[in-house]
């Protein structure tokens, strides 16, 4: 294994080697060969005409060259954003040509013109049949013309649990439940990484992992609180529940953030397969891939969420990604109903039409007019990438949690592309030989000696990993930042850059490639070629597993109580300690310094558990008085046991044990025992604690006295004697 580990309890370190040099370069990779050629061409292209001008003196020509050819040559030699100058200029002019506003409005004749105006001024003099024919022709033209959004959105349809793309690909989108990876011990983390590595060995060739952070959807939790309010009979508890409802709603709208994790798998056609049955094969293969991912990720502790309506789930995901602001107030189903109504208004209802998926998920307009950001429905998007040389060579397990849990409005997309092993081994061997030959010709005093040596070490590391049955991957990471204004977008971008620099990482904006980057961030498992070349980083299976991404600090249970807001990622902490599927038991320990709020936390939990109709008992020997006010405010019972108190415990009281749970599990098979005998047995234990040196004769006399005492109240070994005629317990 290519893992640095000193002991079983220390965190493992995983290696992400630098890219071995796969293209022409000079000085051991310091300068790209293409940049050097362009610098020479541009410099000569300016210098030759200037030198041929006879009207200028030689000194004047030198000054002109220093002001023109020299800076352009240096600029071309360095490049722009990791690209050559010509590539940057080509991309810039392509952006100028392609910048536009993608709108949902069609270029067809509007409804007002179609319904209120005739096609000809003198249409009234023509027969009705002619008018109807013209109307039919207009409808046919309208059906042929598609809105700009239909051309922009790359999904053709969503059926059979998969997405059909316009480029004839088939993909499957799955949602994965994260785990709190960083709270696990080093041994547990190692086991999770090994399980994830096992899945990577059999995973598809291309994979996309998408992490979305957005405002938390607290609708289901609020609905449960409303149900509790309707069922609550105590008026004081109803008031508390209303306050709790308003608190959840206020925090959820302003502070609460949630994260969703998705995996996108792509159908891989078999070589030489038939195109006729490709759709059926794609459906079957993607279903098998989903089951495989579910099995292996369960070993890691993650669960693949089973979707009752996978088509609606995938359409809703696209709707959320393309309508972030609108989706907070208008759900997908409601928006789809409105879109269907609007679509039917534009066509004849008698025509048999198929509504495109773009009409259900696309926003009203997308503005691709700026080179550094995109505007969608009043929200601003900026896409960034981690360049090929922007990674740390040594990373800890789960290091991507830094990006995943950074805050609201930060999305992360990870692309994994598995290369053929034989092809990778051939290229590695070839490049190692080239670098070794360069090493022989280079003196150890040259500046490029260390670069070549690093490339050789990286090549040998990758070659050794491939020999140890690991796979060769190219990994790309895109980061999307969203904000409500340009100023906020710039502030978030600068803060994110500072965070990346503090962790020895780099982040570069996708200048004039925002449209391509935005399309790449959609869950379509396809990255634009230019961005792929600029951000790809070679890594082995062990390095990919070290980038385990399904990490979250959230604790948001369905039927829990609110404890607060996580200060690190602004997620709501809603805990249901009685959920045995998540927690091994319902025990808790509250630790903190004096004045940290231990008593307040305990009181808060008790109040909110009572609001959930959970009976709560608090034993507080020293600080019982601090719970008195809260107890009285919800009509609870405050019992003070002390020499001066009027409260006392009746140790002689008998209450029948509730056997409903045992009967539900085992049936009514157990013989009914005497509750009186069980109570007398417990009383013997109580008196033995008071009188430790009690003799056997005294125990027998005590037993007879207890039986006679209960008999005076009409209680015998028959359990029916515990009740009065109305069914209540005897006092």
Model region roles, listed by residue range:
Residues 1-19:
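Short, charged cytosolic
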Residues 23-51, 197, 558-643:
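Glycine-rich phosphate-binding loop of nucleotide-binding enzymes
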Residues 65-91, 95-549:
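Extended, folded cores of ATP/NTP-driven motor/assembly subunits in large transport
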Residues 89, 212-214, 604-711, 715:
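Switch/coupling segment of Walker-type NTPase motor domains
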Residues 451, 471, 487-488, 498-504, ...:
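Non-catalytic, charge-rich alpha-helical accessory subdomains
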Residues 502-586, 598-601, 605-610:
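Phosphate-binding P-loop/Walker A region and its immediate neighborhood
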């Amino acid at each position: 294994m290519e893992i640095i580990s000193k002991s079983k309890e220390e965190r493992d370190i995983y290696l992400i080697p630098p890219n071995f040099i796969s293209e022409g370069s000079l000085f051991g990779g310091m300068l790209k060969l293409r940049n050097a050629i362009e610098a020479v061409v541009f410099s000569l292209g300016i210098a030759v005409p200037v030198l041929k001008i006879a009207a200028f003196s030689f000194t004047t020509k030198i000054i002109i060259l220093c002001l023109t050819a020299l800076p352009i040559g240096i600029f071309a030699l360095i490049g722009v954003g990791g690209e050559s100058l010509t590539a940057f200029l080509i991309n810039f002019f392509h952006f100028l040509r392609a910048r536009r506003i993608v709108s949902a409005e069609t270029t067809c004749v509007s409804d007002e013109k179609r319904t209120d105006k005739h096609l000809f001024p003198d249409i009234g003099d023509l027969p009705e049949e002619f008018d109807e024919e013209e109307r039919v022709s207009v409808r046919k033209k309208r059906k042929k013309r598609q809105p700009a959004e239909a051309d922009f959105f790359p999904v053709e349809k969503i059926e059979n649990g998969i997405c059909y793309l316009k480029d004839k690909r088939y993909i499957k989108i799955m949602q994965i439940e994260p785990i709190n990876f960083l709270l696990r011990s080093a041994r547990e983390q190692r086991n999770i990484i090994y399980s994830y590595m096992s899945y990577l060995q059999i995973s598809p060739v291309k994979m996309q992992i998408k992490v979305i952070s957005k405002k938390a959807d607290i609708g289901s939790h609020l609905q449960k609180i409303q149900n509790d309010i309707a069922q609550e009979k105590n008026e004081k508890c109803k008031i508390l529940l209303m306050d709790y409802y308003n608190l959840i709603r206020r925090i959820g709208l302003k502070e609460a953030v949630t994260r969703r994790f998705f995996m996108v798998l792509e159908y891989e056609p078999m070589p030489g397969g038939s195109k006729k049955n490709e759709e059926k094969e794609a459906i079957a293969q993607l279903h098998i891939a989903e089951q495989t991912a579910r099995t292996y990720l369960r070993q890691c502790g993650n669960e693949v969420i089973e979707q009752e309506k996978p088509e609606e789930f995938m359409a809703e995901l696209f709707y959320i990604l393309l309508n972030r602001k609108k989706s907070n107030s208008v759900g997908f189903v409601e928006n789809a109903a409105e879109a269907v109504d609007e679509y039917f208004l534009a066509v004849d209802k008698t025509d048999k039409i198929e509504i495109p998926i773009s009409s259900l998920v696309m926003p009203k307009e997308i503005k691709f007019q700026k080179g550094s950001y995109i505007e969608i429905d009043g929200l601003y998007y900026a896409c960034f990438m981690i360049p090929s040389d922007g990674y740390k060579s040594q990373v800890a397990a789960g290091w991507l949690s830094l990006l995943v849990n950074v805050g609201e409005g930060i999305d992360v997309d990870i692309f994994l592309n598995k290369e053929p092993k034989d092809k990778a081994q051939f290229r590695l061997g070839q490049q190692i030989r080239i670098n070794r030959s360069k090493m022989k010709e280079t003196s150890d005093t040259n500046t490029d000696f260390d670069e070549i040596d690093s490339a050789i070490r990286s090549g040998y590391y990758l070659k050794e990993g491939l020999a140890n049955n690991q796979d060769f991957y190219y990994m790309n990471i895109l980061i999307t930042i969203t904000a409500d204004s340009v100023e906020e977008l710039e502030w978030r971008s600068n803060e994110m850059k500072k965070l990346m620099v503090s962790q020895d990482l780099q982040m570069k904006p996708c200048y004039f490639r925002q449209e391509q980057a935005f399309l790449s961030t959609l869950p379509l498992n396809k990255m634009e070629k230019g961005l792929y070349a600029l951000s790809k980083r070679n890594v082995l299976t062990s390095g990919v597993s070290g980038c385990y991404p399904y990490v979250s600090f959230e604790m948001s249970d369905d039927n829990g109580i609110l404890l607060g807001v996580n200060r690190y990622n602004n997620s709501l902490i809603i805990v249901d300690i009685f959920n045995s599927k998540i927690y091994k038991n319902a025990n808790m320990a509250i630790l903190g310094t004096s004045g940290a709020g231990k008593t307040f936390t305990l009181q808060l939990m008790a109040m909110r558990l009572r609001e959930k109709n959970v009976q709560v008992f608090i034993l507080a020997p020293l600080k019982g008085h601090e719970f008195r006010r809260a107890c009285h405010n919800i009509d609870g019972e405050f019992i003070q046991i002390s020499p001066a108190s009027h409260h006392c415990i009746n140790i002689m009281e008998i209450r029948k044990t509730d056997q409903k749970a045992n009967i539900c599990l085992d049936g009514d098979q157990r013989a009914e025992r005497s509750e009186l005998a069980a109570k007398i047995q417990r009383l013997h234990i109580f008196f033995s604690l008071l009188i430790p040196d009690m003799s056997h004769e005294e125990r027998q006399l005590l037993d007879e006295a207890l039986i006679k005492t209960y008999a005076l109240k009409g209680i015998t070994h028959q359990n029916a004697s515990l009740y009065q005629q109305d069914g209540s317990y005897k006092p």
